[in-house]
UniProtKB/Swiss-Prot annotation:
Species this protein is from: Homo sapiens (Human)
Domain of life from the UniProt record: Eukaryota
TM spans (from-to): 47-67, 76-96, 121-141, 161-181, 219-238, 259-279, 291-311
This protein's name: Olfactory receptor 10G6
Keywords assigned by UniProt, alphabetized: Cell membrane, Disulfide bond, G-protein coupled receptor, Glycoprotein, Membrane, Olfaction, Receptor, Sensory transduction, Transducer, Transmembrane, Transmembrane helix
Record's function text: Odorant receptor.
Membrane-topology annotation of the record: Multi-pass membrane protein
Glycosylation sites: 26
């Protein structure tokens, strides 16, 4: 499904670009871009390749293990674990969309990406990233229902409702990414083709456009800002009710267990929103720190999410022990 959407998007955008070329005739269209990537001394190419390769393999295997565990362990066939399965798939796919091209650059020096490849990369990243943003909000709502309305949870969050909400996050991500990608690549690219970034992203592409990008920058800020702020406020509201409900639990053990179920989700939300805010919710810049932050939220964050959810989630740790054939360690 994702591949079909990407191919349709690419066809529409390239058709639009070709029509503009025929109309303007005096502009030279860019056929490819060069991903500058991380600035580093040549002798660090091999060590960086090995470091990012290890991170990439750990990310794919860690998130893949979470998905496998949720699918095979019937005790995890619950809404929160289903949402976690979606999150792991998103993290794994984001890593697969960005990291292989970086690895090729470190090892082979191959940093060229076709115009169509750049379109697909930008679309994929914003599609997956926006879907993840909606999913975090949905997971907070699920925790709100489970802790604040436990007696009604099973009747509200049915299997059908759970699947419908999860599908809604994917549709929302598709709409957002189609809008952003088409808005960026309707601009003419007729000269510079060096993308001073680790992948084709909106701020970096706007700097290469042969036209005024003020409207694009404003629309990007408004669109991403509205979505991020709305989702973040909904998450904060949900956790405000959750904390109030937890504090009313009489036993210390009960409060501790309730907090532990929410700690992992809150941690990954913070890890997601801080770099997102830094990159998109400020004026377009070309600071070296941008590349470092981009590496963090495209390479490091997907790995951190899998680690956080396996270390902070008691149910997931127990399920992994069962999957590995180890006896569960019962607390004394």
């Amino acid at each position: 499904m994702l591949e079909g959407v990407e191919h349709l998007l690419l066809l529409l955008l390239l058709t639009d670009v070709n029509s503009k070329e025929l109309q303007s005739g005096n502009q030279t269209s860019v056929s490819h871009f060069i991903l500058v990537g991380l600035h580093h001394p040549p002798q660090l190419g091999a060590p960086l390749f090995l470091a990012f390769l290890v991170i990439y393999l750990l990310t794919v295997s860690g998130n893949g293990l979470i998905i496998l565990t949720v699918l095979v362990d019937i005790r995890l066939h619950r809404p929160m674990c289903l949402f976690l399965c979606h999150l792991s798939f998103l993290d794994m796919t984001i890593s697969c969309a960005i990291v292989p091209k970086m690895l090729a650059g470190f090892l082979l020096g191959s940093r060229i990406i076709s115009f169509g490849g750049c379109v697909i990369q930008l679309f994929s990243f914003h599609f997956l990233g926006c879907t993840e943003c909606f999913l975090y909000t949905l997971m907070a709502y699920d925790r709100f229902l489970a802790i604040c309305k436990p007696l009604h949870y099973a009747t509200i969050m049915t299997h059908r409702v759970c699947n419908s909400l999860a599908l809604g996050t994917w549709l929302g991500g598709t709409i957002h990414s189609l809008f952003q990608t088409s808005f960026v690549f309707r601009l003419p690219f007729c000269g510079p083709n060096r993308v001073d970034y680790i992948f084709c992203d909106i701020p970096a592409m706007l700097r290469l456009a042969c036209a005024d990008t003020a409207i694009n920058e404003l629309v990007t800020f408004a669109d991403i800002g509205f979505l991020a702020l709305t989702c973040f406020m909904l998450i904060l509201t949900s956790y405000g009710y959750i904390v109030a409900a937890i504090l009313r639990i009489p036993s210390a053990d009960g409060r501790r267990n309730a907090f532990s179920t929410c700690a992992a989700h809150l941690t990954v939300v913070i890890v997601y929103y801080v770099p997102c805010t830094f990159i998109y919710l400020r004026p377009c810049s070309q600071e070296p720190l941008d590349g470092v932050v981009a590496v963090f939220y495209t390479v490091i964050t997907p790995l951190l999410n899998s680690i956080i959810y396996t270390l902070c989630n008691k149910e997931m740790k127990a399920a992994l022990q069962r999957l590995g054939g180890h006896k569960e360690v019962q607390p004394h």
